[in-house]
Amino acid sequence: MAFRYLWFAVACTALTSAVAHIFSGSACDFTGIDVDGAITRLIAKFPDHDFIGREKFYPVVAGFEMRGFNASGFHKLKQYGPAIPYCINGTRMVQVDFINTGVVVLTMPWRHCSGQEGTFSLRSELSRFTTQFHIRQSERDKGIKLFYQGPTIPLTTQNIQINVDGAGRSANAVAGILAMVFPAITKELWDQQFLYSLSRALHQALN
């Protein structure tokens, strides 16, 4: 029994030494690296608005046209929980969760041959997602730079809202009902457009 405890103590000591070696005095050392500060600066650089797609209207069905959409509110995203630093083959990485509390809105203008025009908008009351970055430290000023690694994975998406402005209350009500009746389709639409817009926002903020 005593030998078993002695072996356990030796194993713990060896493991502690190995961890200390990995996280200090090596390429995987996070000492003095302000990861949370880098994430805060990244969010501050997110664009307020980003127009994506065709600038001119294009036909969708007979008499009905749409054009590219505007993504807004990414600069209001918030970090959710602590950043998780780790290493893969000596490369410093960080995993970060973000939360969107309805501040990100995707808006697409539309118009009809009857003269009606308005916007189609999509938002999620609450969404949480996680992504990963490479971390590189400058040897000159010891500052760090993040590089988007991806992928971005949605974790939680709640209450996706579809609004149709300019077509009257009935059209807006129908859009809301369809969003509730077909939640899987609505979520897929949101995930595709949101994650693509987020990827663009990340690249713009980091470049």
Predicted regions: what they are:
Residues 131-133:
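A short glycine/threonine-centered beta-strand motif
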Residues 138-203:
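Extended amphipathic ligand-handling, pore-lining, and cofactor/metal-binding catalytic surfaces
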